[in-house]
């Protein structure tokens, strides 16, 4: 390129973007520059060179600091005066400077004129300004220099020319800079010429630092350049001119002027760089790794030996094939590049994944050229074969028919025991089995394997403990070490166990051999050729001793580490406990100190607050450190027991058949007879395929060694897959018949097992036949002994092994002849495989996945090993839930095929859900009937109650329970019930024949007599006696055919005794009002003797009573007629309907009915309300009122279980009955008094039954009870067997008497009943009431027990069982039946020092129940724990009617006397003729521990809570009474209520005795103007509903007088453990006129 072209490119680059305005500005600047430079001295150097160099330098500065499309003048003005450092000033004006300026001016003018003409020619229109993208700027401003020889031609575009010219300027400046710089001073002509080019800033660092900042400023200004106006440009130009003339970089401006083409081209020699220098520079910049092998120590941390995992037993995959040179290069590079990286493994080699290349190709091989590609598409014709069907298990229709073959190879048979075995044969067989076991263990050599594993683990621990272990965190290292140590412990235990087994086995072999030699010496002949030789291998004592001691020390060290870790853990726990104890003790001291400082006023409050005893914290005991001597002694003892002693030679037994058998002529006669018997016996086998005999072996004689060789192969031609394969072993004796010894089942072979590959296997068999022989043969199934005295007897059964192999045959073409398993969905076998893929392959393929996964986890299989891949995949699939092997057999394999709808759709069906819930006997749907046939007919609200109960399962509702404790107890009882119901679900579904089949009994002519005809025939001719009718048996009905209205409750009221009689009413004025006098009072005062209400013989003019009975059940009321006198007789039958809850008449529902039958006795009083006595002769105006006297409450569950209740019951009469007294008639009741002993009260005789008679549900099936005794109990098996035997003997003698030995606790487990009896402390405050009166204390304790609410198990656990809870559970639940009350009361009496027993018998009305019997000084007392009453033994009104057994803390006595009534039996249990004891001399008492707690802890009940509960109950009862009187106004007499409220605490303290007169006087004093009728009710508190029912049954609200007033008071007395005594006083008041 010539200079003119270069000039044109440079000029176009600098000026094209700015146009004419820029040209004018440049001219002004040139004139200013010339004036500036005249002051300087002209240089002596040639002007061409100087201009060229100067321009080149200026071009370089421009390119470096200037961006494209930027005007030179504007940039210079923007750059400011500090772009370049100042030039050192000197006096340089002269001719040279002047001439240089003139030449510069002329050349510039010429260049400018040429540029203008070129621009006008090439660019007719000015080029618009635009901003360039950063990418273009970056492409333009590259740092790669270009040599002048590599310039491109001028055909390139203008942008390329601009960038290229800048690159050239930059290279020129770079070359000039490389030259040495001259020192400053007065220049010569050459120096003056070169001044502008080479005199640079002496501080170049400052320029370099400032340049990027200016560049940033320029970029910021350039962004706003296109938006500036014309005026702003002119102002900028003026400012730039001034700065150029006066600034410091005027020289720099001249450097940027455009020179001519020949001024900046320098001609010099070409630069050359040698190859050596080039390589040297490349070595400084580039790194070339070495190809030499890197030493191993450089690739591992210091002091670390390489570890080869493959030698330690871990699987290492095959590494990919890489050239060793490449591997060395990579290792050297990694060591230099990343010296601390994780690229190297423990073996010093680069980490590499196993080679992913398969050893065989995945794609099928291409067909050869000779074979035509259409050959595989040709049709192959095969003739159709007729298929033979056989039973089931047929091949699917898609399977090809054909003949298949199964080969059975029967090698031989050997007996491990036979009836003809002599004693020596028994020992020889045992010795042979032991030796086989020894050989098997030696082949496995598990001891050595575990020893090597233990050494490897110890070595791994030592390697992991190295502190310089790389690329592992401390947590990971510690975790690995802990895993190693845990595995070391486990491996050491296994190694010790294996060593002990080996040593024990060797000792046993030697022992049996010695016994065999002793037997041979004793019998003086030999029957077997066995001979045992013990070969000794000597060992090096020194090495053996060292190894032994090293192992001992290593084990001691490991055990010490374990104990130290355990000690450290215990020590940490001790420190924590000790700190807690110190804090507790400090708090206790602070409390004591605070207690001393409090005043006496606050003592009571603090005692009330601290009434709950705090749990005392015991001082912890520090753990004892481990004694190393003890550890060492234990290790050495264990080693001496299980290992070979050091220096002791190794014994290797060798069993051979080198012995000699004694000939027959040297043996005794019995042995010769045995050998003759063996010769007469022969054995053969039958082959049974699919339960059919297909072949049999030849009969072979039994050898003297009891071995039989067959050597036969049976080829079975089959069509279907085999169901079973069996061998039958037969034995023939002489010419007699054959005997089947055993059946041996053979597994169906796998489909991969073919003939030629099947190994010979041994399968064992045994026989249960009993054989006794008359010679030396020991027989089978009969005992024999090796001892002379017949001790240590053995009983062996016939057994042996059959050697066989079963495999599939191979056809002529090499294809196995196996019945195919069709892959289609048709065919039984295919469906079987699809339903259960694993179990369908046959019994040999069954695998327990749980055990397999457990074994894999414990064995720690290497998951990287390809050999384990199928196993690991199978385990992962099985454990993930996708597939599993069930631990049960499938009853319906094809259920999935017959499912007509999916599970999801079935679960969405409302009808199916309803049916499912009903079948599960959910309470809301238990007896749901008439379920609609379509889902659309079932409403969503049907499930609302059930879903609400599920949501509120854990929510405790206090609506039905006024206090929180009882609400919690009710919730807990519900949870216990659900748990127990689930546990006894099996018993409920264990049906008997009578449950399913209801039919009348076939008349039996001898059913009621002991003879052949019996008494049935005599009854036909028996005379009828109408005055003495006999009860006939009723038919029992079940719940299936019952509905509402079918069941009636029949109550027969017969008579009553000692009803309270009225007392004369006396007011303040000693005269009642006219209207308040009863008929009886007036009749008594009148002279007439004809009134039926008054008898002349009635002594002392007593007031009569007119009682009648009202029966209330489920709010249905019936009553009898009114009788007269204190001993009335009704003999009336009342009928009440029964309605089951929710219409459910099932057994479980009937058992859970909580309703009670209330039998109330009322006195009917007639009041004369006639106002005028003068009208008495013409009319009668009376009003009938009834006064409640007492009641008898009988639960319906008792009636249901007893079927009928017949007896005399004590009437519960309130302790205060105003207007009535118990003054008995002296004349009429004298005979009655003679029969009374300790009991006082009124009685009523009843007969209650249900019509029709219902079948009561059995609480638990006998079989289920037996099963629970066997599986759910912690009692000793011998004790349970003794209980079963004891109960069987007792039931055989007296089947109707109750005999109880074991019971079921709250968890469903069987417990021996005496464990429930133990002295337990009653509440302390009860013992302080009567400290000197034991009898009063006993009555008070009995009353406390009776205050705990009664809840029978038949209601709480309906249809399940009778559960017994311990006393602490009973007090926590505050609910229980007779057994819990009796156990608690008996335990209290035992604590008080009384002789007490639990009485299991039958009472009225409870039925089978539990009472308590105590022995006082000279008589027995029978206590009813539910009522708190006690009765004498000879009390005729005692509710206990029969006694079955007595239970004490240490024994059980069953009543074997002829009578069972308490009146007629003797309670002296020391007489064995009267009482059969469970524990006796033959079975002594084993000292059973009690299930009861050591002591009972009582919490005091909060009195404030009791008072709040009292107010709430009173409010509820008042609201109920007002609801019961909807047609009348109910007025409350507050004054009377206050009086009654003050009276109720007196009743609680005196228990209702000896305060009636004081109470009557108080009421007469305060309420004399009122006729008062009322009574207090006393009940234990459980919930509100029983209180409401009790008040309702009294009928106090049934008074219709307009001026009647009511009074109601409630008092609750709290006892410990939240036991509450409730008193309710209800009264009605009528003002006297």
Curated annotation (Swiss-Prot):
Where composition is biased (Polar residues), the residues are: 1068-1092
What is the documented disruption phenotype for this protein?
Embryos show randomized left-right axes, holoprosencephaly, microphthalmia and a variably expressive curved body axis. Cc2d2a null embryos also have cilia defects, which are exemplified by the absence of Arl13b staining in neural tube and surrounding mesenchyme.
Q: List this protein's GO terms for biological process.
A: axoneme assembly; camera-type eye development; cilium assembly; determination of left/right symmetry; embryonic brain development; heart development; kidney development; motile cilium assembly
Q: Where is the composition biased (Acidic residues)?
A: 602-615
Compositional bias ranges of the Basic and acidic residues kind? 1-12, 99-115, 154-174, 209-223, 234-245
Stored InterPro entries: C2_dom, C2_domain_sf, CC2D2AN-C2, CEP76_C, CEPT76/DRC7_peptidase-like_dom, DUF5523, Tectonic-like_complex_comp
- Location of the C2 domain: 1031-1209
Enumerate the residue ranges of region (Disordered): 1-188, 200-245, 590-673, 1068-1094
Q: Which Pfam families match?
A: CC2D2AN-C2, CEP76_C, CEPT76_peptidase, DUF5523
Q: Where in the cell is it found?
A: Cytoplasm; Cytoplasm, Cytoskeleton, Cilium basal body
Q: Which residues form a coiled coil?
A: 440-501, 554-611
Keywords for the protein's UniProt record, in alphabetical order: Cell projection, Cilium, Cilium biogenesis/degradation, Coiled coil, Cytoplasm, Cytoskeleton
Residue ranges annotated as compositionally biased, kind Basic residues, are: 26-42
Tell me the function of this protein: Component of the tectonic-like complex, a complex localized at the transition zone of primary cilia and acting as a barrier that prevents diffusion of transmembrane proteins between the cilia and plasma membranes. Required for ciliogenesis and sonic hedgehog/SHH signaling.
- Report what the protein is called: Coiled-coil and C2 domain-containing protein 2A
- In its UniProt entry, the species of origin is given as Mus musculus
């Amino acid at each position: 390129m010539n200079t003119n072209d270069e000039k044109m490119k440079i000029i176009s680059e600098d000026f094209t973007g700015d146009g004419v305005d820029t040209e004018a500005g440049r001219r002004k600047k040139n004139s200013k520059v010339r004036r500036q430079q005249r002051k300087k001295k002209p240089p002596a150097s040639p002007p061409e060179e100087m201009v060229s160099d100067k321009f080149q330098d200026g071009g370089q500065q421009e390119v470096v600091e200037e961006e494209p499309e930027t005007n030179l003048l504007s940039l210079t003005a923007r750059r400011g005066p500090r772009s370049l450092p100042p030039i050192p000033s000197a006096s340089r004006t002269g001719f040279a400077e002047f001439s240089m300026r003139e030449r510069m001016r002329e050349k510039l003018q010429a260049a400018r004129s040429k540029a203008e003409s070129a621009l006008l020619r090439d660019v007719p229109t000015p080029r618009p300004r635009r901003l360039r993208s950063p990418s273009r700027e970056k492409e333009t401003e590259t740092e790669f220099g270009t040599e002048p020889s590599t310039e491109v031609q001028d055909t390139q575009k203008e942008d390329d020319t601009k960038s290229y010219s800048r690159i050239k300027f930059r290279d020129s400046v770079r070359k000039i800079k490389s030259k040495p710089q001259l020192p400053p001073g007065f220049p010569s002509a050459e120096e003056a010429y070169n001044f502008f080019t080479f005199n640079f800033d002496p501080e170049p660092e400052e320029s370099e630092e400032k340049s990027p900042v200016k560049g940033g400023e320029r970029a910021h200004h350039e962004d706003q350049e296109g938006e500036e106006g014309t005026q702003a440009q002119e102002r900028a130009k003026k400012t730039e001119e001034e700065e150029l003339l006066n600034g410091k970089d005027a020289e720099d401006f001249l450097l940027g002027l455009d020179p001519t083409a020949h001024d900046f081209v320098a001609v010099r020699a070409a630069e050359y760089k040698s190859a050596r220098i080039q390589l040297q520079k490349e070595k400084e910049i580039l790194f070339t790794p070495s190809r030499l092998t890197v030493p191993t120590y450089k690739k591992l941390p210091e002091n670390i030996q390489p570890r080869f995992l493959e030698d330690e037993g871990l699987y290492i995959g095959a590494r990919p094939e890489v050239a060793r040179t490449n591997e060395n290069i990579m290792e050297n590079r990694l060591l230099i590049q990343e010296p601390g990286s994780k690229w190297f493994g423990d073996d010093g080699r680069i980490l590499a994944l196993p080679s992913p290349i398969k050893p065989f190709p995945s794609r099928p091989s291409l067909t050869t050229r000779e074979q035509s590609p259409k050959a595989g598409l040709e049709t192959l014709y095969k003739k159709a074969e007729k298929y033979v069907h056989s039973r089931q298990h047929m091949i699917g229709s898609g399977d090809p028919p054909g003949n298949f073959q199964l080969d059975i190879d029967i090698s031989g048979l050997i007996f491990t025991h036979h009836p003809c075995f002599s004693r020596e044969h028994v020992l020889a067989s045992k010795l042979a089995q032991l030796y086989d076991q020894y050989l098997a263990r030696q082949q496995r050599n598990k001891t050595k394997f575990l020893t090597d594993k233990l050494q490897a683990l110890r070595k791994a621990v030592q390697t992991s403990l190295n502190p310089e272990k790389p690329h592992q965190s401390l947590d990971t290292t510690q975790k690995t070490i802990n895993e190693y140590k845990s595995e070391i412990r486990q491996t050491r235990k296994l190694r010790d166990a294996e060593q002990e087994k080996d040593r024990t086995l060797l000792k046993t072999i030697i022992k049996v051999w010695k016994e065999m030699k002793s037997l041979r010496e004793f019998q003086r002949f030999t029957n077997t050729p066995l001979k045992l030789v013990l070969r000794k291998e000597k060992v090096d004592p020194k090495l053996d001793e060292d190894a032994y001691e090293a192992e001992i020390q290593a084990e001691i060290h490991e055990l010490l580490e374990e104990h130290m870790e355990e000690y450290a853990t215990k020590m940490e726990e001790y420190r924590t406990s000790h700190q807690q104890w110190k804090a507790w003790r400090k708090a206790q001291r602070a409390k004591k100190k605070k207690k001393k400082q409090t005043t006496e006023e606050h003592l009571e409050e603090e005692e009330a607050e601290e009434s709950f005893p705090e749990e005392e914290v015991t001082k912890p005991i520090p753990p004892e450190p481990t004694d190393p001597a003890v550890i060492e002694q234990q290790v050495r003892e264990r080693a001496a027991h299980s290992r070979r002693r050091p220096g002791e030679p190794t014994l290797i037994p060798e069993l051979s058949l080198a012995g000699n058998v004694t000939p027959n002529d040297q043996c005794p006669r019995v042995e010769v007879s045995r050998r003759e018997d063996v010769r007469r016996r022969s054995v053969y086998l039958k082959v049974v395929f699919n339960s059919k005999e297909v072949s049999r072996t030849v009969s072979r004689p039994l050898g003297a060694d009891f071995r039989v060789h067959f050597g036969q192969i049976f080829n079975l031609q089959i069509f279907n897959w085999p169901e079973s394969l069996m061998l039958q072993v037969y034995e023939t004796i002489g010419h007699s018949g054959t005997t089947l010894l055993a059946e041996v089942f053979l597994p169906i072979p796998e489909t991969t097992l073919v003939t030629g590959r099947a190994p010979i296997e041994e399968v064992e068999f045994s026989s249960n036949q009993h054989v006794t022989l008359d010679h030396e043969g020991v027989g089978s199934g009969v005992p024999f002994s090796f001892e002379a005295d017949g001790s240590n007897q053995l009983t062996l059964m016939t057994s042996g092994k059959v050697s066989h192999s079963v495999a599939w045959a191979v056809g002529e073409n090499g294809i196995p002849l196996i019945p195919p398993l069709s892959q289609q969905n048709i065919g039984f076998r295919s469906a079987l495989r699809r339903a259960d893929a694993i179990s369908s392959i046959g019994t040999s393929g069954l695998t327990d996945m749980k055990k397999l996964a457990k074994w894999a986890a414990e064995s720690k299989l290497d998951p990287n090993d390809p050999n384990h891949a199928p196993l690991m995949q199978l385990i992962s699939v099985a454990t993930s839930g996708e597939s599993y092997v069930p631990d049960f057999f499938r009853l319906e394999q094809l259920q999935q095929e017959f499912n007509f709808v999916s599970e999801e759709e079935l679960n969405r069906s409302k009808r199916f859900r309803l049916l499912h819930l009903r079948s599960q006997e959910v309470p809301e749907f238990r007896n749901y009937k008439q379920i609609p046939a379509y889902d659309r007919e079932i409403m969503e609200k049907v499930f609302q109650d059930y879903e609400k109960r599920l949501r509120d399962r854990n929510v405790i509702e206090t609506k039905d329970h006024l206090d929180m404790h009882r609400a919690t107890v009710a919730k807990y009882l519900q949870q216990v019930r659900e748990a127990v119901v689930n546990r006894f679900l099996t018993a409920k579904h264990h049906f008997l024949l009578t449950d399913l089949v209801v039919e009348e009994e076939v008349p039996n002519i001898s059913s009621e007599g002991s003879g052949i005809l019996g008494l049935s025939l005599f009854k036909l001719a028996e005379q009828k006696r109408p005055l003495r009718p006999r009860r006939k048996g009723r038919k029992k009905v079940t719940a299936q055919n019952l509905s509402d209205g079918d069941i009636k409750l029949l109550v027969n009221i017969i008579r009553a005794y000692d009803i309270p009689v009225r007392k004369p009413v006396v007011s303040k004025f000693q005269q009642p009002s006219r209207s308040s006098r009863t008929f009886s009072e007036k009749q008594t005062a009148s002279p007439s003797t004809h009134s039926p209400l008054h008898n002349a013989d009635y002594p002392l003019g007593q007031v009569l009573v007119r009682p009648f009975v009202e029966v209330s059940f489920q709010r249905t009321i019936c009553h009898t007629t009114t009788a007269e006198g204190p001993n009335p007789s009704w003999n009336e039958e009342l009928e009440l309907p029964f309605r089951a809850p929710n219409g459910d008449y099932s057994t479980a529902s009937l058992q859970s009915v909580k309703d009670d039958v209330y039998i109330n006795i009322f006195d009917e009083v007639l009041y004369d309300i006639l106002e005028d006595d003068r009208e008495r002769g013409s009319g009668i105006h009376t009003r009938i009122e009834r006064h409640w006297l007492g009641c008898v409450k009988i639960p319906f569950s008792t009636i249901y279980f007893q079927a009928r209740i017949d007896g005399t019951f004590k009437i519960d009469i309130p302790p205060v009955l105003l207007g009535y007294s118990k003054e008995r008639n002296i004349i009429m009741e004298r005979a009655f008094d003679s029969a009374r002993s300790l009991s006082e009260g009124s009685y009523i005789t009843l007969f209650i039954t249900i019509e029709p008679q219902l079948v009561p549900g059995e609480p638990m099936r006998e079989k289920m009870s037996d099963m629970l005794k066997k599986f759910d109990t912690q009692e000793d098996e011998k004790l349970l067997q003794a209980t079963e035997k004891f109960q069987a003997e007792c039931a055989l003698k007296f089947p109707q008497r109750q005999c109880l030995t074991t019971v079921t606790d709250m968890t469903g487990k069987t417990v021996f009943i005496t464990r429930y009896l133990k002295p337990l402390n009653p509440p302390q405050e009860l013992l302080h009431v009567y400290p000197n009166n034991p009898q009063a204390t006993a009555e008070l304790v009995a009353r406390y027990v009776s205050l705990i609410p009664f809840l029978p198990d038949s209601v709480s656990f309906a249809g399940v069982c009778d559960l017994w809870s311990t006393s602490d559970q009973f007090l926590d639940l505050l609910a229980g039946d007779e057994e819990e009350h009796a156990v608690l009361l008996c335990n209290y009496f035992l604590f008080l020092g009384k002789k007490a027993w639990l009485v299991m018998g039958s009472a009225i009305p409870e039925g089978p129940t539990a009472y308590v019997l105590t022995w006082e000084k000279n008589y027995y007392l029978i206590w009813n724990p539910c009522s708190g009453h006690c009765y004498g033994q000879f009390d005729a009104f005692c509710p206990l009617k029969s006694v079955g057994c007595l239970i004490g803390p240490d024994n059980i006595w069953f009543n074997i006397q002829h009578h069972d009534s308490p009146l007629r039996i003797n309670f002296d249990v020391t007489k064995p003729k009267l009482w059969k004891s469970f524990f006796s001399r033959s079975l002594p008492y084993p000292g059973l521990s009690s299930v009861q707690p050591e002591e009972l802890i009582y919490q005091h009940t909060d009195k404030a809570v009791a008072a709040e509960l009292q107010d709430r109950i009173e409010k509820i009862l008042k609201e109920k009474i007002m609801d019961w009187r909807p047609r009348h106004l109910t007025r409350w007499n507050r004054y009377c209520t206050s009086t009654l409220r003050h009276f109720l605490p007196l009743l609680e303290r005196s228990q209702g005795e000896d305060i009636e007169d004081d109470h009557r006087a108080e009421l007469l004093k305060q309420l004399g103007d009122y006729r008062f009728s009322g009574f207090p009710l006393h009940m234990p508190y459980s919930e509100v509903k029983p209180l409401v029912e009790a008040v309702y049954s009294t009928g106090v609200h049934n008074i219709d007088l307009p001026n009647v007033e009511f009074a109601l008071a409630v008092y609750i007395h709290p006892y410990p453990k939240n036991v509450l005594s409730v008193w309710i006083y209800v009264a009605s008041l009528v003002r006297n006129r």
